């Protein structure tokens, strides 16, 4: 088994506390509302939403995947960090056991946010994951993030 790590960093004009509330804490409600073609629904299968919780995300008709299951490892509201693993679903190929994700939102000097993400692909056997394989997922996540950012700009009184 191998572990392949990819890091990404991008910025937003939205303050970190507001972005964390929308992007992490209320994502299960907000994303199906603003991008139903991407995510149809999210439901908790086990737990209370905190660490140890298992969630099932059902994708919308615009996706070529059906569902995934996430296991939440940590949510730190004060430091704006979130970590979880993709543990099941058709987004995992036969060569990938799981994918660990860590997201940290850091307040930027200009009042916005620096978003730092780390993805760790745990492969089965000697399979190698190349960055080109990860690129499509990064692009979809970036598009979804831009939708959330746009929603927050259009609805400035929400998530304060």
From Swiss-Prot:
Organism superkingdom: Eukaryota
Family annotation (SUPFAM superfamilies): Bet v1-like (SSF55961)
Alphabetized UniProt keyword annotations: Allergen, Fruit ripening, Pathogenesis-related protein, Plant defense
Transmembrane segments: none
A GO MF label: abscisic acid binding
Signal peptide as annotated in the record: none
GO cellular component: cytoplasm; nucleus
InterPro entries for this protein: Bet_v_I/MLP (IPR000916), Bet_v_I_allergen (IPR024949), Plant_def-hormone_signal (IPR050279), START-like_dom_sf (IPR023393)
GO biological process: abscisic acid-activated signaling pathway; defense response; fruit ripening
Function: May be involved in ripening of fruits.
Family as reported in the entry's similarity comment: Belongs to the BetVI family.
Subunit structure: Monomer.
Protein name (database record): Major strawberry allergen Fra a 1-A
Species annotation: Fragaria ananassa
